[in-house]
Amino acid sequence: MAEQLSLFGSPEPEQAPVKHARTVEQAKHAPAPEPIAAYASVVLDIPTRALSEPFAYGIPQSFDNEAQIGSTVLVHFGNRAAAGYIVDIVSELGELQGNNTLDPARIKLIEAILSKPLFGAEAARIARWMSREYVATLSECLRLFLPPGGSPRVVKGDDGAWTVERPAVKPIQNRWVMLTPEGFDYTPPKTAVRQRQLIEALQCGPVTTRDLNLLYNSMSATIKALEKRGVVVVEERRAWRGCSEQTTLSSASGKAPVALTKGQQKALAQIERARLDAHGDVVLVDGVTGSGKTEVYLSAIERVLAAGRSACVLVPEISLTAQTVGRFRSRFGETVAVFHSRLSAGERLDQWDMVASGAARVVVGARSALFCPLSDLGLIIIDEEHETSYKQGSSPRYHAREVAAEMARRYRCPLVLGSATPSAEALDRCRRGTYNGATWTRVEMPERPGHAVLPTVRIADLRREFSHGSRSMFSKPLMEGLERVVERREKAVLLHNRRGFAPFLMCRECGCVPTCNHCSTALTYHERTHTLQCHTCGSSWRVQPYPAPTSRCPKCGSRYLAKMGLGTQQIEDALHQMLPDDVAIIRMDADSTRGKDAHKKLLEQFDAADCAVLLGTQMIAKGLDFPEVTLVGVVNADFALKLPDFRAGERAYDLLEQVAGRAGRGDRPGEVIIQTYLPEDPVIRAVAEHDRSIFTDHDLDQRRDALYPPFVRLVNILVWSASRDDARDYIGHIAKLLKRRWHAAAPDFLRAGSAVPQVLGPASCVIERAKDRYRFHLLVKSPVGYHVSDDIDACLKEVGSVRGVSLSVDVDAYDLM
């Protein structure tokens, strides 16, 4: 239960000190208000577009020393209480941005200081930039910089009273027992067995009371007795949860190699030049899988730390394994803080505080780690920069690469992007040489260290397999490859990017495919639980498909409701039937990795096995380094190729190239077998021939002709509502305003030699209904370099809001479904 405090009463003694002004009753008869010492620009913690801009408040003299940029404050807004964040402080009201016409006599006072500063002035400026760039409210952007658990919130109780609700997550303290100088000379009586045990346990250093009690079955009385004698002392120290993540993975060592390859040396030299130039330049490390990009990161971080600065490393969530973290902690020890979604709330808070206190100087984490309070940031690294997970899926829909580039510019530090399959945007900016004032440089790393070589890639044409009578999910080449792995006692990785048992059920008589009652998506069948599950909203229904006697089609009543297609669970069953019992079959997907540390346990199981097959979805394609893996198989490469999305080919190529790179990373050669019905597709050919240009040349030509990024900026404006008509009418109004605005400005664009922004739609989304909400969207194609966000923001302010209709603006959109 979160701690609560009445706003207009006195705080309880045990609560954090909070200064309050008057109670409501006192305010009616209060003397003249307290003199104003300064003025604050306050962003209300109310995420609505109408209240996005800061408001001016006076800082009473009694708060003058406590009110700082980043402080959470209590203010009155209209007839309610609200929490807000100070983003600027000035001595004269006219100095506040946008508030030079206000009457000082009408300025309200800040009622209370609710927290110490949670972010600094630079973070406030970056949040302002994000708010404008991504057409998001400023409070949403500021929340990114808050500690896990957030800041105090103002909530209205059932009795109508406003109260402060403090974050429920709190720090914890450990009690450490240590010998005093006199204690080292103390000799316990011969009969004092417990005292001797305690003294012996403390000879090598301090130990927590918890560990002592676990080791010796309650030492509390002995500790108290020796503490009274001055033999030991007990100290309370802040416990840093989330620092004890250990792994037995053999490849988690961060030990530096004897020598760097020529490619690694070249990349490191370019990063060092960018660091010394201090212009916020970008270095793209374009290295094949297994080329040693992580070692380049580690070496670059060493130089930054030696210069007294800090470093932030972003890794895709699915790649943020114990193996990845282990390499950084092996090299940099306790100075590494880690952030990912599998940490508990308490662990996230402690890792954040480690960074804020300066105890951690290297942060390794997923997208949100970018907003940690690192002091004197000297290097930002984004590994696997092509990954779509760097794009936030909810407002503010920022891209970590773009925010990192802005941070690098402001902190005058290099931004390093690493990938074996760089995004089209990153490659285009490197071809241009500059983007948004920063220099973009591409460095190639074409070879693997040591004796490792790129794997051979074979294409298994499933059309030919079918014509030869095969009906198995495994082609002859893939079955033979698995047999060789078993004979040699090696390891294999199998990719199939569809979890569940079967992608859908279908009635063989009427063709009905059961869909979600709340979404316009087909339901996925899960064999273990005999349920149909919606992977959009999470709803599920019990079902017994054919040949179960109770199988019934929901439309026609036929019992022939059959499983269609393949999911990872079905492939797992087939592998168990095909391979010997002593081969470990390990499935890794969203269903098998739900528990805490599930990722780590599955990978440790795979690492420890003598012979094993790791089967999984895209999470097995990234960040895994197992030298014993000699075979990678792709069960069906065609799923992602023909989706209605201009990035479908790029995503498919990235996934196939990345998973292929898991093979042959040690001394033994690797082999990749890709099963497909489309062997002539440029994506398949590019992976098979280790020639990226086969795909990228084809892809760029298509994007140039159709005007898609990187040749334009793409904005997706999405609305949703329980009422289909309300959603359609609202987005139609937005489209009309945008078209009218740009039609009127067309002569100005043409005089400047620029294309006029285009509006496509509105239209219903591919997934037209989700969670009982109808969804419509429109696309804006804007010239690169034109700040289209300002035009969109102006139109949204003009159209206003409609009750029951929600809106989201996705600048540089990735998800068009």
Where in this protein do the model-derived segments appear?
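Accessory, non-ATPase domains that flank or precede helicase/AAA+ motor cores in DNA-metabolism machines
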Residues: 1-419, 426, 432-452, 487, ...
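Inter-lobe coupling/hinge segments of SF2-like helicase ATPases
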Residues: 251-265, 269, 279-728, 732, ...
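Short helix-capping segments at alpha-helix termini
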Residues: 332, 579-581, 741-752, 800
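Surface-exposed amphipathic alpha-helical segments in non-transmembrane regions
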Residues: 693-694, 700-701, 738-739, 744, ...
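Short amphipathic alpha-helix segments
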Residues: 726-760
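Short conserved micro-motifs at the rims of enzyme active sites and ligand-binding pockets
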Residues: 729, 771, 789-791
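Short proline/glycine- and acidic-rich turn/helix-capping motifs at secondary-structure junctions
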Residues: 750-754, 758-771, 808-817
